[in-house]
From Swiss-Prot:
UniProt keyword annotations, A-Z: Amino-acid biosynthesis, ATP-binding, Cytoplasm, Histidine biosynthesis, Hydrolase, Nucleotide-binding
Source species taxonomy: Bacteria, Bacillati, Actinomycetota, Actinomycetes, Kitasatosporales
Main location: cytoplasm
Record organism: Streptomyces griseus subsp. griseus (strain JCM 4626 / CBS 651.72 / NBRC 13350 / KCC S-0626 / ISP 5235)
GO annotation, biological process: L-histidine biosynthetic process
Protein name per Swiss-Prot or TrEMBL: Phosphoribosyl-ATP pyrophosphatase
HAMAP family: HisE (MF_01020)
Length: 90
């Protein structure tokens, strides 16, 4: 799998949410299920990041962080929040 930047992933997720089939695209499926379902995944992934960071190695923690970032970006897409909207608060 090719590495993606945060911005490239966000653009890809926007496209999948807009054009993807919920039956074949996890992103489209999550957006279709709504903010509540996505929020549950964000909380789950955040807990997994914590556990991996505390009890596992760097690679496991990095993988869990990537999954958390994915779900946070799906939430952003579902709510119509742009990267610039978030960057304004950094």
């Amino acid at each position: 799998m090719a590495n993606k930047t945060f911005e490239e992933l966000f653009t890809e997720l926007q496209l999948k949410a807009a054009e993807g089939d919920p039956a074949t695209s996890r992103t489209a499926e999550l957006v279709d299920k709504g903010v509540h379902a996505i929020g549950k995944k964000v909380v789950e992934e955040a807990a997994e990041v914590w556990m991996a960071a505390e009890y596992e190695g760097k690679e496991a923690a990095a993988e869990e962080i990537s999954q958390l970032l994915y779900h946070v970006q799906v939430m952003m897409v579902a709510r119509g929040i742009s990267l610039d909207d978030v960057y304004a608060h950094l």
